[in-house]
């Protein structure tokens, strides 16, 4: 029996010890470079999220922009880019977070979302 999404999983490259020893980095550039893989990834995510009732989709820099923007378009929703500290040109709000290998901060424009909006967050991974 084939596991769900096994076809997509096979398109993702694993790079051991990146960016640090002991970390298994899942490189989705191979999935993104495959027209079937990218299309199916977006279609399947959109199908699963269609009934969630989100108002917007947010994608975390940088690969979250690719998948998140495509999913937002497929769902007919607006897209909110979540950027690393200091990258957005307008006034921002942000949040610090921890990684396996350090800390960082992400920010959005202060007017990117309204109070009470339900936002679907997409990234390529969660460390």
Give the location of each predicted region.
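PRPP-associated nucleotide enzymes
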Residues: 1-127
């Amino acid at each position: 029996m084939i596991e769900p999404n096994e076809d997509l999983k096979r398109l993702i490259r694993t790079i051991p010890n990146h960016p640090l020893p002991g970390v298994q980095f899942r490189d989705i550039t191979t999935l993104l470079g495959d027209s079937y893989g990218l299309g199916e990834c977006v279609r399947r995510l959109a199908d699963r999220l269609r009934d969630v009732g989100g108002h917007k989709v947010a994608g975390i820099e940088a690969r979250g922009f690719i998948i998140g923007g495509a999913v937002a378009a497929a769902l007919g929703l607006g897209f909110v880019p979540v950027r690393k500290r200091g990258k957005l040109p307008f006034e921002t709000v942000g949040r610090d977070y921890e990684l396996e290998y350090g800390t960082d901060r992400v920010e959005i424009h202060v007017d990117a979302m309204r109070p009470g909006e339900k936002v679907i967050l997409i990234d390529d991974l969660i460390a």
